[in-house]
Amino acid sequence: MATPKAAIETMDVGSSPIERYQNVLGAEAWSEFSDAFSLLAERLRGRVVWNVNSTPRGGGVAELLASLIPYSRGAGIDERWVVIEGSREFFDFTKKAHTLLHGVAPDGSDVTREERRVYEETMQRNTGPLLEMIRPGDVVVLHDPQTAGLVAALAAHGCQVIWRSHIGVDQPNEMVRNAWRWLRPYLVDAAAYVFSRRAYVWDELESAKVHVIAPCIDPFTTKNEDLDHASVNAILRASRILPGPDGEATFLRQDGAAGRVRRAAILSTTVPADARLVLQVSRWDRLKDPAGVLQGFAEHVAPRSDAWLVLAGPSVHAVDDDPEQPGILAHLEAIRSALDPPIRQRIVIAQLPMEDIDENAAIVNALQRRAYVVVQKSLAEGFGLTVAEAMWKAKPVVASRVGGIEDQIEDGRSGILIADPRDLRSFGDAVLGVLADEAKARSLGQGARLRVLRQFLAPRYLKEQTELVSSLVA
């Protein structure tokens, strides 16, 4: 019996002019940036650059693709984005693989024979439709473990295949190495491997194929565009996070059209208009440690300050490739419910609407700009786009010294790093130190914005990726 074909989703990404960065970059950097695109367009000669991942929304990979592909298209590159289809069993397994690659076994086991069968069957179901869309000679960028099993078929089809890993750990344990051993055979035929940090590169990969490209943010996206104080408040009122009438809750969409916030967040309680906010934005993911943030705030910040905590994440059923989220959210709500009322009322769990991705981005933007301190107390982190987003908005950030966060924050200059993310007292003391010292908060925020300006904006990422693709099609 033939394997049924998957329904591949093609994303509408539009185009954006690279010229908007001309005033951000110096003359020399702008020339190098624009020349890289010109060279690639010449070398591609009508071939397409494809990006393949497993979800259209709700995570850092989807955000990167949505914001960066339009620049390639605006520069004359035919770059596209498609999303594979998978069953609940597939996403249960790939979530497990994700945590194994961070050194954590959620169910205490390695990869089973049945899980491998589900994975390979899903890859087979998606291969046929992809080969009907993608031509020999095209370049295909496959993102994360969910797509690793597609490498061989696409390479045999005559494509230049890049496998892009957005996750990793600084010090791999045996669980991580076992996950590498399971995935490595799928990747042999890739033309290149891209990691976010040198420390994340796997053992036994062909070194000549390995490249390191750190992620970035785009300051012109809906999530990062400038918002004045009135717009911030209007957006947060329209989403029911702050009390009061909606006002003009407008924002600029990714395609340049005007948008308006119309949907409310699902909240445990509303935030007072004058509250000082400690904010973490993330998926409902155990590796982001929202439970640790909640407990650290309740035990060490709330009793010694007037601050409120907002834990913000996506509407719990909106992210297809992360089936653990409902259970983690329920656990958070149980922890909050058990707290004494005076502390409980200052902790807000907010599920943000996801039906309109630009609307969601506008709400996150407003929350980050409204926050007094932004935290990211991850137990593991590939890069941590929410850190760079808050830094760009000149917010003081308190975050774990893990993964790509350590690359972004210079401790004491552009944020504060917590050496042990499980040390709730140190976390609380760091947050209190910022809340209690306005000059320190301002200085850290200014240093944070400058750090992102110099190291983590889109042109650097786009130039490095464009040069890699150019080298493969020369």
Predicted region positions:
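Catalytic cores of nucleotide-sugar-dependent glycosyltransferases that transfer UDP/GDP/TDP-activated
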Residues: 1-474
